Amino acid sequence: MTTTLQQRESASLWEQFCQWVTSTNNRIYVGWFGTLMIPTLLTATTCFIIAFIAAPPVDIDGIREPVAGSLLYGNNIISGAVVPSSNAIGLHFYPIWEAASLDEWLYNGGPYQLVVFQFLIGIFCYMGRQWELSYRLGMRPWICVAYSAPVSARTAVFLIYPIGQGSFSDGMPLGISGTFNFMIVFQAEHNILMHPFHMLGVAGVFGGSLFSAMHGSLVTSSLVRETTEVESQNYGYKFGQEEETYNIVAAHGYFGRLIFQYASFNNSRSLHFFLGAWPVIGIWFTAMGVSTMAFNLNGFNFNQSILDSQGRVIGTWADVLNRANIGFEVMHERNAHNFPLDLASGEQAPVALTAPAING
């Protein structure tokens, strides 16, 4: 008997690279989206850390009054931020090579654009990588669909809103207090609290938290005991076991009696789809709300107060909200504007055009 051995041709470096990138046997899956995700997220993270620590003040309003955001210029972890690029730059793409010098690039807030653009590309690729890994493993694509909710929210805040407002200086600062400042100014200029899409987003986030807590507590309370009373119930679960780890019938019966029968799911698959869909849809609506308000399609306003038959104002919550918004707007960009538009567009006050004659 004769055995013939044929030497296998060695794969090229490109083929080896392709096999490594798409292999699901790696400890961490890379994927084709990962080849772009890894460098962009590393770039964004590195630039953010350096800018947060040591970036010089930025002329955010374009009026030659720089605002310091880094730690070395007097801020702490709470007040520090990567300050958005200058209003003098507007929506222009502002990479390092567009500036006359590195100092000019830093003064005009170039690091903000670098971090934001690299970060957005990175999270887009992360979402694509989730789909890619699901496809390789034969899974359904709902993981990347769920992740599209925070991706759409970040895109609305960092890209769509500055485009609608005409300048990246209106983007959200990359810091804790900068985030809150952005929220307050957004309320002042767009009345987001009175926008129905924001209300749906609040229902999605808080409702999702409630449903998650309810589900986790119900499951934990109806675990099937596989251990003695002196051992933790967690030891009764073996990874990959075929048996149910909790009694869904008991959980269904408890919740159905606690509220009413049809408030409880009797199908585990529909239950978990609901738990995933509720917050995702809510955050989608919030992202759509921010994207529409970016072009000044704002929340409901009740600027006309309710008057009685004598013409006196009947105070309502809308009046309180309007005064708060005007107060926020007065504090915002106080050196760039004299008055917010709500105050500047009121009735004109009579002024003296000629000086009175003084006879001494």
Swiss-Prot record:
Q: Which residues are removed as the propeptide when the protein matures?
A: 345-360
Q: Which Gene3D superfamilies match?
A: Photosystem II protein D1-like
Q: What are the site positions for Cleavage? A: A344, S345
Q: What is its EC number?
A: 1.10.3.9
GO MF, one term, reads: electron transporter, transferring electrons within the cyclic electron transport pathway of photosynthesis activity
Q: Which residues bind a quinone?
A: H215, S264, F265
Where does it sit, as one GO cellular component term? plasma membrane-derived thylakoid membrane
Q: Where does it live in the cell? A: Cellular thylakoid membrane
Q: Which InterPro entries match?
A: D1/D2, Photo_II_D1/D2_sf, Photo_RC_L/M, Photo_RC_L/M_CS, PSII_D1
- Indicate how the chain sits in the lipid bilayer: Multi-pass membrane protein
Q: What is the top-level taxon of the source organism?
A: Bacteria
Could you say which residues bind Fe cation here?
A: H215, H272
Keyword annotations = Calcium, Chlorophyll, Chromophore, Electron transport, Herbicide resistance, Iron, Magnesium, Manganese, Membrane, Metal-binding, Oxidoreductase, Photosynthesis, Photosystem II, Thylakoid, Transmembrane, Transmembrane helix, Transport
Phenotype for N266T: IoxI; herbicide resistance
Q: Does the keyword Transport apply?
A: yes
Q: Where is this site: Stabilizes free radical intermediate?
A: H190
The site (Tyrosine radical intermediate) lies at Y161
Q: List the disulfide bonds.
A: none
- Please share the entry's free-text remark on the cofactor: The D1/D2 heterodimer binds P680, chlorophylls that are the primary electron donor of PSII, and subsequent electron acceptors. It shares a non-heme iron and each subunit binds pheophytin, quinone, additional chlorophylls, carotenoids and lipids. D1 provides most of the ligands for the Mn4-Ca-O5 cluster of the oxygen-evolving complex (OEC). There is also a Cl(-1) ion associated with D1 and D2, which is required for oxygen evolution. The PSII complex binds additional chlorophylls, carotenoids and specific lipids.
Modifications after synthesis and translation = Tyr-161 forms a radical intermediate that is referred to as redox-active TyrZ, YZ or Y-Z.
Q: How does it assemble?
A: PSII is composed of 1 copy each of membrane proteins PsbA, PsbB, PsbC, PsbD, PsbE, PsbF, PsbH, PsbI, PsbJ, PsbK, PsbL, PsbM, PsbT, PsbX, PsbY, PsbZ, Psb30/Ycf12, peripheral proteins PsbO, CyanoQ (PsbQ), PsbU, PsbV and a large number of cofactors. It forms dimeric complexes.
What family is this protein classified in? Belongs to the reaction center PufL/M/PsbA/D family.
Kindly give any further remark recorded in the entry.
Answer: Cyanobacteria usually contain more than 2 copies of the psbA gene.
Name assigned to this protein? Photosystem II protein D1
Species assigned in the record: Synechocystis sp. (strain PCC 6714) (Aphanocapsa sp. (strain PCC 6714))
The root-end lineage is: Bacteria, Bacillati, Cyanobacteriota, Cyanophyceae, Synechococcales
Name of the encoding gene = psbA
